[in-house]
């Protein structure tokens, strides 16, 4: 059977680093207040010359180089983002142009913080269906552009950045020892829309709008929803939490990460945490954390990696893959 195997990985972050103490002159908050509630200490904020497309392109180039490929080897460019450069065309098409790719196809996916999980799942389906041999999967965001900088409950949480994977078709044996995507489960429930959303859009207010969130409500639902899709992936494969080498969760809030790992009985030492240095980068969160753990030598070939995320909608999902 065909598996979607990770061939390369890359990431990109804006030059500017904004520490918690930098907020003290903007809103009523403190480093202690932010760290205690979120685990975040700093985040990267895009400058005027940095966009979702420029960050996504940089991460894509790094992933392609890491894979030992050329941009022209890519069949599909799939971008997960909620902060595109334009309403249309898709920012994936702009990244495709920047990379010099003129064949194949490209499109955006919007599932907010779950976007990268949705994108990997979609890429896997295209690969296993024979429509693409190599897919560039990107998560890129400039959430700083949709924040209300007077709302201390949200503006301290988010950062900007991008991460990318090259997924490639490879022959597998149909076993959980195969490299590549082993299972993926996605969910959504629009009844929770008002708990996490942006209060603008071209068809309603003709504005970009700002992010609005009921933090306590999100936290209340997060752990149960996340563990539900993970357990579905375990059931599908016959694997268990004990088999996991690395748990790479969406980096939204350290309390949610800790609670999810505890409920799943995943040891603290197996959890990849980058929320302290990146904040919540939405669809870029998981690939940035992955890239960090690969670069520092934690994630190695053959490791079983569990990815998960939850975002506005609500949307949520999990992917099991062997590196």
UniProtKB/Swiss-Prot annotation:
Task: Please name the GO terms of the biological process aspect recorded for this protein, alphabetically.
Answer: fatty acid biosynthetic process
Recorded GO MF terms: 3-oxoacyl-[acyl-carrier-protein] synthase activity; beta-ketoacyl-acyl-carrier-protein synthase III activity
Example of a GO cellular component annotation carried by this entry? cytoplasm
Pathway info: Lipid metabolism; fatty acid biosynthesis
Checking PANTHER family in the record gives:
3-OXOACYL-[ACYL-CARRIER-PROTEIN] SYNTHASE, BETA-KETOACYL-[ACYL-CARRIER-PROTEIN] SYNTHASE III, CHLOROPLASTIC
Please report which protein family the annotation says this sequence is part of. Answer: Belongs to the thiolase-like superfamily. FabH family.
* Protein name as it appears in the record: Beta-ketoacyl-[acyl-carrier-protein] synthase III
- Gene encoding this polypeptide? fabH
């Amino acid at each position: 059977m065909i598996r979607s195997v990770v061939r390369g990985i890359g990431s990109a972050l804006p030059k500017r680093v904004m520490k918690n103490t930098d907020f003290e002159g903007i809103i009523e908050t403190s480093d202690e207040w932010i760290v205690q509630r979120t685990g975040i200490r700093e985040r990267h904020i895009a400058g005027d010359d940095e966009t979702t497309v420029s960050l996504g392109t940089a991460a894509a180039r790094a992933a392609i180089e890491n894979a030992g490929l050329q941009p022209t080897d890519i069949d599909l460019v799939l971008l997960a983002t909620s902060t595109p450069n334009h309403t249309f065309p898709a920012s994936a098409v702009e990244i495709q142009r920047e990379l010099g790719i003129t064949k194949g196809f490209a499109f955006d996916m919007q599932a907010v913080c779950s976007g990268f999980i949705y994108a990997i799942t979609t890429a896997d389906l295209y690969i296993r269906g024979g429509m693409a041999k190599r897919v560039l999967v990107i998560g890129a965001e400039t959430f700083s552009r949709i924040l209300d900088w007077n709302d201390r409950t949200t503006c301290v949480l988010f950062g900007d950045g991008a991460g990318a994977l090259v997924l490639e078709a490879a022959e597998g044996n149909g076993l959980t020892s195969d490299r590549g995507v082993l299972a993926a489960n996605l969910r959504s429930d629009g009844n929770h829309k008002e708990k996490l959303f942006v209060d603008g859009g071209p068809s309603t207010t003709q504005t970009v709008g700002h992010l609005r969130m009921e933090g306590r409500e999100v936290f209340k639902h997060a752990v149960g929803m996340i563990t539900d899709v993970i357990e579905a992936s375990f059931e599908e494969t016959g694997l268990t939490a004990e088999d996991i080498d690395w748990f790479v969760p969406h980096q939204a809030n350290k309390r949610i990460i800790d609670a999810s790992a505890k409920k799943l009985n995943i040891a603290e030492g197996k959890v990849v945490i980058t929320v302290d240095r990146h904040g919540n980068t939405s669809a870029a969160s998981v690939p940035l954390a992955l890239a960090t753990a690969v670069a520092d030598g934690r994630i190695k070939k053959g490791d079983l990696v569990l990815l998960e995320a939850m975002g506005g909608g609500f949307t949520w999902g999990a992917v099991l893959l062997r590196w």
